[in-house]
Amino acid sequence: MLGSLSWEHMLVLVVVGLVVLGPERLPGAIRWTSNALRQARDYLSGVTTQLREDLGPEFDDLRVPLSELQKLRGMTPRAALTKHLLDGDDSFLTGAFDRPVNGAAAQPPPAPAPPPEPHRSGQTPFDADAT
């Protein structure tokens, strides 16, 4: 739950807590929060243990589809399309249809340089209605 918080974020939270709660109430608030998180973790581990006891070996069978679903949720649409419809070959999506021969990388043609903008002499056009 708090795995994505870095030490810098935690320091900012402590400083904000110190400003909002004050130095007298901050240790009690930290203690209360840690106890609440510990109780929630114990409750969730108890629920997991109870499910394991109630379902028995079917619990592990239930975990396999759930882990596959979790993998699919993390995929981008392009990765899902590549994996399931194209069997991992993404050359259709990337445009790299021809494989390089003997491991030699094909060099793309250099991009054409944009034509230089012609220098205009004279007065700059002015539109009184546009300004």
UniProtKB/Swiss-Prot annotation:
This is Sec-independent protein translocase protein TatB. The chain crosses the membrane at residues 2-22. Keywords: Cell membrane, Membrane, Protein transport, Translocation, Transmembrane, Transmembrane helix, Transport. Residues 96-131 are annotated as: Disordered. GO terms for biological process: protein transport by the Tat complex. The keyword RNA-binding does not apply. Residues 107-116 have a biased composition (Pro residues). GO terms for molecular function: protein transmembrane transporter activity. GO terms for cellular component: TAT protein transport complex. Part of the twin-arginine translocation (Tat) system that transports large folded proteins containing a characteristic twin-arginine motif in their signal peptide across membranes. Together with TatC, TatB is part of a receptor directly interacting with Tat signal peptides. TatB may form an oligomeric binding site that transiently accommodates folded Tat precursor proteins before their translocation. It holds the Pfam family TatA_B_E. It is a single-pass membrane protein. The gene is tatB.
